């Protein structure tokens, strides 16, 4: 997944 941003 994307580790560039944190999605809660």
Curated annotation (Swiss-Prot):
Instruction: Indicate where this protein resides in the cell.
Output: Secreted
Q: Which UniProt keywords apply?
A: Cytolysis, Dermonecrotic toxin, Hemolysis, Lipid degradation, Lipid metabolism, Lyase, Magnesium, Metal-binding, Secreted, Toxin
E.C. number, please? 4.6.1.-
Q: Give the stretches traversing the membrane.
A: none
Give the catalysed reaction(s), semicolon-separated.
an N-(acyl)-sphingosylphosphocholine = an N-(acyl)-sphingosyl-1,3-cyclic phosphate + choline; an N-(acyl)-sphingosylphosphoethanolamine = an N-(acyl)-sphingosyl-1,3-cyclic phosphate + ethanolamine; a 1-acyl-sn-glycero-3-phosphocholine = a 1-acyl-sn-glycero-2,3-cyclic phosphate + choline; a 1-acyl-sn-glycero-3-phosphoethanolamine = a 1-acyl-sn-glycero-2,3-cyclic phosphate + ethanolamine
Q: Which tissue types show expression of this protein?
A: Expressed by the venom gland.
Per its Swiss-Prot or TrEMBL entry, what cofactor is needed? Mg(2+)
- MF terms per GO, please? lyase activity; metal ion binding; toxin activity
For the biological process aspect of GO, one term held by this record is: lipid catabolic process
What superkingdom heads the lineage? Eukaryota
Q: Which GO terms describe its cellular component?
A: extracellular region
Is the keyword Lyase in the record? yes
Its main localization is: secreted
Q: Explain how, and how many, cofactor molecules are bound.
A: Binds 1 Mg(2+) ion per subunit.
Q: What does this protein do?
A: Dermonecrotic toxins cleave the phosphodiester linkage between the phosphate and headgroup of certain phospholipids (sphingolipid and lysolipid substrates), forming an alcohol (often choline) and a cyclic phosphate. This toxin acts on sphingomyelin (SM). It may also act on ceramide phosphoethanolamine (CPE), lysophosphatidylcholine (LPC) and lysophosphatidylethanolamine (LPE), but not on lysophosphatidylserine (LPS), and lysophosphatidylglycerol (LPG). It acts by transphosphatidylation, releasing exclusively cyclic phosphate products as second products.
Return the similarity comment: Belongs to the arthropod phospholipase D family.
* The protein's name in its UniProt record: Dermonecrotic toxin LgSicTox-LOXN5
Q: Which organism is it from?
A: Loxosceles gaucho
């Amino acid at each position: 997944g994307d580790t560039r941003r944190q999605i809660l």
